[in-house]
Amino acid sequence: MASLQALRGTRDILPPETQVWQWIEQTAREILGRAAVQEVRTPIFEQTALFERGIGEATDVVGKEMYSFRDRGDRSLTLRPEGTAGTVRAYIEHGLASQGGVQRLRYTGPMFRYERPQAGRQRQFHQLGLELLGTADARADAEAIALATQILQALGLKNLRLDLNSVGDACDRAAYRQALVDYLTPYAADLDPDSRDRLERNPLRILDSKDERTQAIVAEAPSLHDYLSERSRQLFEQVQQLLTHLGIDYRLEPKLVRGLDYYTHTAFEIISSDLGAQATVCGGGRYDGLVSQLGGPETPAVGWAMGLERLVLLLQQGQAVPPATLDFYLVSRGAIAEGQALILAQKLRSAGFGVELDLSGSAFGKQFKRADRSGAIACLVLGDAEAEQGQVNLKWLQSGEQQTLDQSELLQDSDHWRSRLQAARTVSPVEVAPL
């Protein structure tokens, strides 16, 4: 019988790599929380029509990449390929617009697209997203970008570049679309196959083709900026001014278009020069028409999503990641000691300490080796002799220093031991398995 393994394009995330994921998520949660952003959790699968209407039937995501199926009720369902459409559906369904003000929402979770697996791109991948719904103010665009850069900086990531563009409103894009088609049509035979297919369905996507021959043709194409309305120009200028005031560097990239049809006005990507072909770690922009397009009230909005796999890849390249908070590794040997060790572990955890209890029942030597590999700051050693005296041996794993103390001393003077543990704690890189 063939062995059962994870499907191509999916992967298991195991310790210690999970520590990296938790650190990314915790960092984002803290930063966004300070900006009054609240979490929303939406279903992993939705009606297929949600993505067809929201993302756009002419997009590659809808046309080629979605995992769609029919359930036993003969309903067409799809595993979510991105997070914004589901968040907007929830915003409409639960009447969040009627609460007034700006809804500041975030999400984290798995997404699904049928793509060729490669480093930083899986068929099941994870995104962290931010959505600010209910404001057309340029400050929202700047704040969204500022929060994204703050998260990436807090993770210690370097060699990042912010690319910025405006894709205008629907009227701007319609005029530009025709001009682009008129320009590209004489070159149709010279375009790569994907771009030839997009020429009729979604010509703006040709602008970010990776084919060198197509890029050379596109380099001389009309500029979208020449087709922006006065209002679109003013909004884009305001966003640029605000980013400058915030001290956020950016590069204007007139060929930048996002792969989803709902974007309007501001579009941006944060690019890492330390990644290969999959260099975008965060992408987003404004989507003023999506809420009404999905049946809700006219609602301007802006948001972004980060690819967690790509952040992990960057952190794998040498960035130090805080280890899991494990204070003590508790080893025991003997009938009395083993029972008492369980009680001591629970009491220490209740006092706020991180404790791993060795449950192997093996000799002390083997337990000590596991303690050395555990990442704990100190090892607590309990034999029957110590248990009968209500004592425990403490060994600081980094220095090798040892001492014997009463168990009650650990519990009653917890602040002292917490400060000792903190002083001994060091930040060390966590091994991350290749993606």
UniProtKB/Swiss-Prot annotation:
GO terms for cellular component: cytoplasm. Transmembrane segments: none annotated. Its EC number is 6.1.1.21. It is found in: Cytoplasm. It catalyses: tRNA(His) + L-histidine + ATP = L-histidyl-tRNA(His) + AMP + diphosphate + H(+). PROSITE patterns: AA_TRNA_LIGASE_II (PS50862). GO terms for biological process: histidyl-tRNA aminoacylation. One of its GO terms (molecular function) is ATP binding. Keywords: Aminoacyl-tRNA synthetase, ATP-binding, Cytoplasm, Ligase, Nucleotide-binding, Protein biosynthesis. Pfam families: HGTP_anticodon, tRNA-synt_His. HAMAP family: His_tRNA_synth. Homodimer. Belongs to the class-II aminoacyl-tRNA synthetase family. This is Histidine--tRNA ligase.
